[in-house]
Amino acid sequence: MLGIGNLAKLVFGTPNDRKVKSARPLVAQVNALEEQFRALSDADLIGKTRELQGRAQSGEDLDKLLPEAFANCREAARRALGLRAFDTQLMGGIFLHQGNIAEMKTGEGKTLVATFPAYLNALAGKGVHVVTVNDYLAKRDAHWMGKVFAQLGMTTGVVYPFQDDAEKREAYRADVTYATNNELGFDYLRDNMKGSIEQMTQRGHFFAIVDEVDSILIDEARTPLIISGPSQDRSELYKTLDAFMPELAPEHYKLDEKARNATFTEEGNEFLEKRLQAAGILPEGQTLYDPESTTIVHHANQAMRAHKLFMRDQHYIVRDDEVVLIDEFTGRMMKGRRLSDGLHQAIEAKEGVSIQPENVTLASVTFQNYFRLYDKLSGMTGTAATEAEEFAEIYKLGVVEVPTNRPVQRIDEHDRVYRTATEKYAAVIEAIKEAHAKGQPILVGTTSIEKSEMLSQMLTKEGIQHNVLNARQHEQEAKIVADAGKLGAVTIATNMAGRGTDIQLGGNVEMKVMEALAADPEANPDEVRARIEAEHAAEKQAVLDAGGLFVLATERHESRRIDNQLRGRSGRQGDPGRSLFFLSLEDDLMRIFGSERLDKVLSTLGMKEGEAIVHPWVNKSLERAQAKVEGRNFDIRKQLLKFDDVMNDQRKAIFSQRLEIMHTEEVGDIAADMRAQVIDDLIDRHLPPRAYAEQWDVKGLHDAVIDRLNMDLPITDWAGEDGVDQDTIRERIQQATDAYMAQKAEQFGPENMRQIEKQVLLQQIDSKWREHLVTLEHLRSVVGFRGYAQRDPLSEYKTEGFQLFETMLDGLRFDVTQQLARIRPLTDAEREQMLREYQQQQAETEAQMHPEHEEAEGGEVSGRVAGFDETDPTTWGNPSRNDPCPCGSGKKFKHCHGVLA
């Protein structure tokens, strides 16, 4: 029987139905223009773009231009790629243009969909950013979809790591720019550390289309992007603390796996105190509870977390003497990404690899706050509905489920739950053998590298050929995914979220053609393609007859969305398929969330070894547990955002002020205002209002003026005059300072003085902001304890954060004023000394760039092997990543030939 809610939906339709219905008339308008645009020549398509650009840039609403722009783009894609966009793809493009998240199933052509809103919004001339999850996809999509934009007379750029600023500037100035979320965020931070407008790379934040939007805006929302510099070396402390960790007994610590946190118990603190005192780290008489012990306690906690909560091959791998993190949502290696607060160093000590120094934050931003900079934001994904509330609340984005072009024919079976992991894996192997026997391609989903490799060993014992895709095989990813739909293929993969490459039944035609032509360059491309397409059609039919792709998952993820993404790999474009989850009561999700109750139920039912329970109730129970985890994670992200918003408001104020200074030719007024405020502060501090003259601290004011303003003024004499008040002394100091600074400007020349003032302002802003970030981080780490005193940590953080910000601004004014007051022109002798040092530096740089001219003892070329040939990399030995490239390009090795290493 239908409930009242379901009955209402039947009568009135769901909000999603209404949104889809409202887009249909626009799709019809685009379809009505199709024949008209098909009749246009290639030059006419570009001419249409120029006409639409003129209308958009003269103020015409983009919504009015949509039908013509979409029709033009559809025709360009048909000519450039041989792809005609379906109505559902046009609909997805409409929702993206309107600033929504378009939920489109795997295989529905999201890459092509993005070109429609990108083209329409690029007509405004402000640039559009299409955001992908990795560099491979950014380059692939820019090259592939760039053909469509070229057909339309528009430029395409791609941004990736290690480009120089000139290349990045050019990419950002293109009409449409493809980039990863990481690179966009880092470029934003780097731009706000530049010394002039000309050095900046980005040109604003107008419109972004985020692919795999749930992965970027939700899974990575808690990870800030940080540009940092090295701090003091504490490697010995990490090693000493790490040595104690294996000695910890269960009563020494308490684990909270749900929150991924660990704390020492009372017994643990006593154990730690004794060990630290014996090792000489904790001085005699000092306890862990003393304020001086804060750093030691913090690093001991991190060492324990490294041992008890971070597992090798699940959370990280060790490669080339380095701990490389693994993204738990996508299974990808996150090279260059490091855990903060000493946790990464603790893991390095645990694994016995080189311990890299901790870093001090120079600039940071979260993805939540970076993407909220855009005037308009939209996104695409295969799974967003489960997180619709979070998208709406944090990003003000609606989620619209776009209908599939063809009905989904995949069969999603009920989960099978076993009592032990051993029973579960035995059943998994049997299911794989059964499907493999009929040639059905199988995608086996696992949650960690360790489990994927264990399954691989089990399949090898059974003699079943298979591929493994995890962070270790990251480089072969595209090839493995392309082959996963072939007849009889078995592919084991860690989380497939955000992989970006569709699994096509029968294999990927384009990749087969490329391989065939690479193997035989003399072959006729058309003949090769015709042969491969015929073979592919036969193989695809055999796969369809076998039941399509079988997605077999070995565990539920904490997030329903990740499970749905794995399921969505099967049944693309109306193909048949099947998905099935195998679980056990020993799985992490089951163990942490209520497996005991289920175990009792299974015992009551009298289940025997190897038997599974299959029931819709189990699915619902698991989904409730997952919803609980998602809700808790949402609350954590929401709370983190509230804290980050405090810093974000301050960041925006500082970056905006910095930008204004870079844009302003004449910053003398800003420096003069700061000087006036400094003088006011000095007067108020030493000659307080409503204080009698005999209560004034005249000597203190005299010394402060010498220190801050670099002038020895007769303040004692002024204070002794009859009828002199604070305002008179303030005015005299101000006049003397103005005259002193005017004299400096004359000595340097007006143009030089302008440059000096600008550089001093920017340097001091950067320096103060860096110090302020460290202070805010410290405040953030301790403010949580205020909750024990019945005070709201967030309110305390806001209040104290604002006070710290005001203190920073006061310090900024004082330091800028002091530095400008102390500068002076160089003497001739100093200028000659500087010139000599500069020439010496230049000579050293030249020698580094061309070391073949610099011979060491024994006639060997310094830094290179004997028999060196700059055109032959085999003679280069092993250059360090940061050495100049031996080819003589002048670039660092890692940015030149080292890219290929």
UniProtKB/Swiss-Prot annotation:
Binding-site residues, ATP: 89, 107-111, 502
Membrane topology: Peripheral membrane protein
UniProt keyword terms in alphabetical order: ATP-binding, Cell inner membrane, Cell membrane, Cytoplasm, Membrane, Metal-binding, Nucleotide-binding, Protein transport, Translocase, Translocation, Transport, Zinc
UniProt enzyme class: translocase
Domain of life assignment: Bacteria
Entry cofactors: Zn(2+)
Subcellular location: Cell inner membrane; Cytoplasm
Cofactor: binding comment: May bind 1 zinc ion per subunit.
Any one Gene Ontology BP term: intracellular protein transmembrane transport
A Gene Ontology cellular-component term: cytosol
Alphabetized GO MF terms: ATP binding; metal ion binding; protein-exporting ATPase activity
Binding site for Zn(2+): 885, 887, 896-897
Catalyzed reactions per annotation: ATP + H2O + cellular proteinSide 1 = ADP + phosphate + cellular proteinSide 2
Location of the region described as Disordered in the Swiss-Prot/TrEMBL record: 838-883
Major subcellular location class: membrane
Sequence similarity: Belongs to the SecA family.
Subunit note: Monomer and homodimer. Part of the essential Sec protein translocation apparatus which comprises SecA, SecYEG and auxiliary proteins SecDF-YajC and YidC.
Protein name as catalogued: Protein translocase subunit SecA
The organism of origin for this protein: Paracoccus denitrificans (strain Pd 1222)
